[in-house]
């Protein structure tokens, strides 16, 4: 099925020694080592993200990658495929929340390289425990319930690792939908910085983390 929105993706034209080359905007940004995690996290999308991460590692295993996240979450196993690839490859993967990072989206945001996890000023983050429906015979429902509990424990342990919070605090936050504004996500340990504009280049004024309040 053809995505009707694909025709709306801008094309960037560049001049080279061999003439003009055109890229869709996402392919051009991939050259700058920028990866987008947008929309629902599911298997097809996860495969594309994993492929991009592996490609960028093969291009330069020492150069950082930046992952921009605007996602309501999705399938746990698909998210874990992205998460495990982020940890597996050699380049550091910084994460940036634009819009929202909910459920599995917030998990991927927290899994970024420490010190390189960012939320923009009006971004929102939501954490909660994994959920799933169970149907069939009682024994099958019991098996599925045990699997969900096992996944919840694993994710809680990883949130403890990434946020520095105690397991008790994580379990309390994950028990129901917990919504966080950008500065609250920083306090929780999901991100390290909250920016309203891109950090300065060498020679510019120092970048300011807006979650630290106004400067004098």
Curated annotation (Swiss-Prot):
Q: Which leading EC class covers this enzyme? A: hydrolase
Q: Name one Pfam family in it.
A: CLP_protease
Catalytic activity from the UniProt record: Hydrolysis of proteins to small peptides in the presence of ATP and magnesium. alpha-casein is the usual test substrate. In the absence of ATP, only oligopeptides shorter than five residues are hydrolyzed (such as succinyl-Leu-Tyr-|-NHMec, and Leu-Tyr-Leu-|-Tyr-Trp, in which cleavage of the -Tyr-|-Leu- and -Tyr-|-Trp bonds also occurs)
Any one GO CC term of this protein is: endopeptidase Clp complex
In terms of PROSITE patterns, this protein maps to: CLP_PROTEASE_SER (PS00381)
- Write out the similarity annotation: Belongs to the peptidase S14 family.
Which named protein is this? ATP-dependent Clp protease proteolytic subunit
Q: Which organism is it from?
A: Sphingopyxis alaskensis (strain DSM 13593 / LMG 18877 / RB2256) (Sphingomonas alaskensis)
């Amino acid at each position: 099925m053809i995505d009707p929105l694909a025709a709306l993706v801008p094309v960037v034209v560049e001049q080279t020694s061999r003439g003009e080359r055109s890229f869709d905007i996402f392919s051009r940004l991939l050259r700058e080592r920028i990866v987008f995690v947008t929309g629902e996290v599911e298997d097809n999308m996860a495969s594309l993200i994993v492929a991009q991460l592996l490609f960028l590692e093969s291009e330069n295993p020492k150069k950082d990658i930046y992952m921009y996240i605007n996602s309501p979450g999705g399938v746990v196993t698909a998210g874990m495929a992205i998460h495990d690839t982020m940890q597996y490859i050699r380049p550091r993967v910084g994460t940036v929340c634009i819009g929202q990072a909910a459920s599995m989206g917030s998990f991927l945001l927290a899994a970024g390289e420490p010190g390189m996890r960012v939320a923009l000023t009006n971004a929102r983050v939501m954490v909660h425990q994994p959920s799933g429906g169970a149907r069939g015979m009682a024994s099958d429902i019991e098996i599925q319930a045990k699997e969900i509990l096992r996944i919840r424990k694993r994710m809680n342990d990883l949130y403890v690792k990434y946020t520095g919070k105690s397991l008790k605090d994580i379990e309390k936050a994950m028990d129901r939908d917990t919504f966080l504004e950008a500065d609250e996500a920083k306090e929780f340990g999901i991100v390290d910085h909250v920016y309203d504009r891109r950090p300065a280049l060498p020679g510019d004024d120092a970048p300011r983390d807006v979650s630290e309040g106004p400067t004098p």
